[in-house]
């Protein structure tokens, strides 16, 4: 079994432990990883960093948490080194001055260096277009805050993404869509930051880091689109409940003077009883005031 397959196997076992909430044997797997020479290529292709990070968040074992943090910290250095090389290459790229053969060869080599694919699963690292540099203080500050949001919980280490570059992409897309740095622009950036940092919605941040959601998409998504699956389900249930209440109030019912409207204080009401939960629980009573149209319910 090759090194990549072995690391991928460990990652799968860690994922199962997280799913089952049973970390028995996790320390042995983490020690195996500690003794393995991990490269940035292996980190990106196996996504083992995300598995270790998920285990760290779930565990209450201090020794396990410490070892997981140590691994993530050591892997982060690989990403920092890679980012440093990329920045140095960007600074060292010669400006076009002459048509000499040596300069042409140097340019050709610098263009060819990024070509070898790091992994098929992470093309975004090499295919993102270059972002224009801005001297606008507001835009630069927004890029910094977006970078910090993307770095929440260190998921970027596991994926192997340059957060500074990605945040610049997102900010550039927002700026191009809005056209200036007015309040609309600031509110747009602020909502991206809030949702990317949301501890209850880590899926959004991971999808952005992995490229499943592109910078162009996250730049224009609505709050509803960025919401977590759990919040979407709650909103869906509330919408269904509101529709049902409205329909119940309009489909007949029994007229009574037993209820007093808390809005107009009249007793001219119509009520409907519906079994909305299990059969052994009380029915839900929907009441509508025939005088002012006020609606309420109780169990």
Swiss-Prot record:
Entry annotated with the keyword Phosphoprotein: yes
Biased composition, Polar residues: where in the chain?
Answer: 87-101
Q: Where does Zn(2+) bind?
A: 261, 264, 289, 292
Residue numbers carrying Phosphoserine: 59, 100
UniProt domain TFIIS central: residue ranges: 138-254
Region of interest (Disordered), residue spans? 82-127
Where does this polypeptide localize?
A: Nucleus
The family database entries (InterPro entries) matched by this protein are listed as: TF_IIS-typ, TFIIS/CRSP70_N_sub, TFIIS/LEDGF_dom_sf, TFIIS_cen_dom, TFIIS_cen_dom_sf, TFIIS_N, TFSII, Znf_TFIIS
Q: Which GO terms describe its molecular function?
A: DNA binding; zinc ion binding
Report the stretches of sequence that form zinc fingers (TFIIS-type): 257-297
Tissue-wise expression: Testis and ovary specific. Specific to testicular germ cells.
- Is Nucleus one of the keywords UniProt gives this record? yes
Pfam families for the chain: Med26 (PF08711), TFIIS_M (PF07500), Zn_ribbon_TFIIS (PF01096)
Instruction: Report any one BP term from Gene Ontology.
Output: transcription elongation by RNA polymerase II
The UniProt keyword set, sorted, is: DNA-binding, Isopeptide bond, Metal-binding, Nucleus, Phosphoprotein, Transcription, Transcription regulation, Ubl conjugation, Zinc, Zinc-finger
Question: What's in the GO CC field?
Answer: centrosome; ciliary basal body; nucleoplasm
UniProt biased composition (Basic and acidic residues):
102-116
Q: Where is this cross-link: Glycyl lysine isopeptide (Lys-Gly) (interchain with G-Cter in ubiquitin)?
A: 57
Q: Where is the TFIIS N-terminal domain?
A: 5-82
Task: State the family it belongs to.
Answer: Belongs to the TFS-II family.
Instruction: Describe, as the record does, how this protein assembles with itself and its partners.
Output: Interacts with the basal transcription factor GTF2B. Interacts with REXO1.
PANTHER family in alphabetical order: TRANSCRIPTION ELONGATION FACTOR A PROTEIN 2, TRANSCRIPTION FACTOR S-II ZINC FINGER DOMAIN-CONTAINING PROTEIN
Q: What is known about what this protein does?
A: Necessary for efficient RNA polymerase II transcription elongation past template-encoded arresting sites. The arresting sites in DNA have the property of trapping a certain fraction of elongating RNA polymerases that pass through, resulting in locked ternary complexes. Cleavage of the nascent transcript by S-II allows the resumption of elongation from the new 3'-terminus.
**What's the protein name?**
Transcription elongation factor A protein 2
